[in-house]
Curated annotation (Swiss-Prot):
Protein name per the record: Phosphatidylserine decarboxylase proenzyme
Listed EC numbers: 4.1.1.65
Any one Gene Ontology molecular-function term assigned to this protein's record: phosphatidylserine decarboxylase activity
Name of the encoding gene: psd
Major location category of this protein: membrane
Post-translational events: Is synthesized initially as an inactive proenzyme. Formation of the active enzyme involves a self-maturation process in which the active site pyruvoyl group is generated from an internal serine residue via an autocatalytic post-translational modification. Two non-identical subunits are generated from the proenzyme in this reaction, and the pyruvate is formed at the N-terminus of the alpha chain, which is derived from the carboxyl end of the proenzyme.
Source species: Rhodopseudomonas palustris (strain ATCC BAA-98 / CGA009)
Length: 232
């Protein structure tokens, strides 16, 4: 393997949503160097951080019917049974919910937790309070998606936070997704909620680190059947 290919294998590409930001930071950095070199070095650090924030690494997703994988990198902040927001259309009974908080240092590309078809997408304007607070799921700006699978419906909500002010979705209603497929992105810190079918037992705990497309949140079929893996 050449040195160039080796470097490419170690450094993930930048997501296209990050191009304007990284380019803008780089331009400002050049201006800062022209004004005063110490400012330019500060700009260089910020440009590198921006490129790091918008990284788009490949992930190896376990592929088996019934597995629910994490839609986001971050920390599992809540595992509770709670009534889902009405826009999901999942009823008024409490359902298992796994919440994953993404800091500004996590990769913010979001991935489908299951293989299924997008039944519903609803954008809800709102506030920008701390995404770690429980009420953020109802008060904050959010983009809600319902995935239909053979084992029931899965609700996925992208929630904006104090710093995150832009939710990006790459998908549309009726579109099929495979587990681990990229479906969106949230800029600069936020939260992802996953609502599981009634009676599902989450396989993660609060405080655990989750990796998008890889960490298994739940098994809708149960058991320990074999699985294959897909890298994307």
């Amino acid at each position: 393997m050449s040195i160039v290919n080796s470097v490419r294998a170690q450094i993930p590409p930048i997501h296209r949503e990050g191009y304007p930001f990284v380019g803008g930071f780089a331009l400002v950095t050049l201006i800062l160097f022209w004004i005063w070199s110490p400012l330019g070095w500060i700009g260089t650090v910020l440009t590198i951080w921006c490129a790091y924030f918008f990284r788009n690494p490949a992930r190896t997703t376990p592929v088996r019917d019934g597995l629910v994988v994490s839609p986001a990198d971050g920390r599992v902040s809540m595992v509770v049974d709670i009534i889902p927001p009405p826009e999901l259309g999942l009823g008024a009974k409490p359902l298992p919910r796994v919440s994953i908080f993404m800091s500004v240092f996590n990769c913010h590309v979001n991935r489908s937790p299951v293989a299924g078809r997008i039944e519903r997408i609803v954008y809800s304007p709102g506030k920008f309070i701390n995404a770690e607070l429980d009420k953020a799921s109802e008060d904050n700006e959010r983009n809600s998606m319902v995935l239909s699978t053979e084992h029931g419906q899965i609700g996925v909500i992208q929630i904006a936070g104090l710093i995150a002010r832009r939710i990006v979705s790459f998908v549309r209603e009726g579109q099929p997704l495979v587990a681990g497929e990229r479906f969106g992105l949230i800029r600069f810190g936020s939260r992802l909620d996953v609502y599981l079918p009634e009676g599902t037992k989450p396989l993660v705990a609060e405080g655990q680190t989750a990796i998008a497309g890889e960490t298994i949140l739940a098994d809708l079929k149960g058991g320990d059947a074999g699985r294959t893996y897909r890298t994307d």
